[in-house]
Regions:
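Haloarchaeal acidic low-complexity proteome signature biased toward cell-envelope/secretome components but also
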Residues: 1-26, 85-89, 148-153
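Alpha-helical transmembrane segments of multi-pass membrane proteins
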Residues: 28-41
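Membrane-interface interhelical connector segments
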Residues: 40-53
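Short aromatic-rich membrane-water interface segments that cap or initiate transmembrane helices
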Residues: 51-64, 124-135
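Hydrophobic cores of alpha-helical transmembrane segments in multi-pass inner/ER membrane proteins
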Residues: 64-72, 136-148
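Cytoplasmic juxtamembrane regions at transmembrane-helix boundaries
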Residues: 80-102
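Mid-bilayer segments of alpha-helical transmembrane spans in multi-pass integral membrane proteins
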Residues: 100-110, 134, 138
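Interfacial helix-loop-helix junctions of multi-pass membrane proteins
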Residues: 109-133
Length: 153
C-alpha cells in the first residue's frame, strides 16, 4: 500500500526517482553494451571518442552515457501526461522503445559520427543509419523503460 501511495504521489507531482533511473540505466546499458561488444565489435571506439581507445574505457564511457540517457528518460516520463504510463512495465517499455529510436536517430545517427570525425577517427558519415545500432538502442530503451517501472515499485 505504501508503494502504491508513493507511486501515485510521484505521478501527481512529477517527482523523479533518480536512483531508480540510474539502476535502470546501468541494467539496460550492460545489455546494450554486450551487443556493442560482441555483435557490433565497436566498444573500443566509444572509448576512443574520449582519446583512449580500449575495451575498459569504452565500457566506462558507454555506461556513463547509459546513466545520463536514463536520467533524461526519467525526467521526461515523470511529467504529465507521460507519468501515468511510466508505472506499468509494459507501457513504460513502450515509452522506452520510442526513446530508444529517438536516441538512435539523434545520438547514434548524427552525434556519434560527427564526434568521431571531430576527434580524427574514421567516421561512417552522417547520418549513420546502421540497423545493428537501431536494434541496440531499441533494446536499451525497452529495458530502460521496463526496468524503470519495475524498480519504481
Amino acid at each position: 500500500m505504501e508503494s502504491e501511495t508513493e507511486t501515485a504521489v510521484r505521478r501527481e507531482t512529477g517527482t523523479v526517482d533518480w536512483t531508480t533511473a540510474i539502476l535502470a540505466g546501468l541494467g539496460a546499458g550492460v545489455v546494450m553494451g554486450l551487443l556493442i561488444q560482441f555483435v557490433m565489435g565497436i566498444m573500443p571506439v566509444i572509448g576512443a571518442l574520449y582519446g583512449a581507445e580500449g575495451l575498459v574505457t569504452g565500457w566506462v564511457a558507454h555506461l556513463v552515457h547509459s546513466v545520463a540517457f536514463a536520467l533524461v528518460f526519467a525526467a521526461i516520463v515523470s511529467r504529465p501526461p507521460l507519468a501515468k504510463y511510466a508505472d506499468s512495465p509494459g507501457t513504460a517499455a513502450g515509452l522506452g522503445l520510442g526513446y530508444g529510436v529517438l536516441l538512435w536517430a539523434v545520438a547514434a545517427a548524427v552525434v556519434m559520427p560527427t564526434w568521431m570525425g571531430a576527434v580524427g577517427l574514421p567516421s561512417p558519415g552522417v547520418p549513420n543509419l546502421d540497423p545493428q545500432s537501431l536494434v541496440g538502442h531499441v533494446v536499451f530503451g525497452v529495458l530502460l523503460g521496463g526496468l524503470y517501472a519495475v524498480l519504481s515499485r
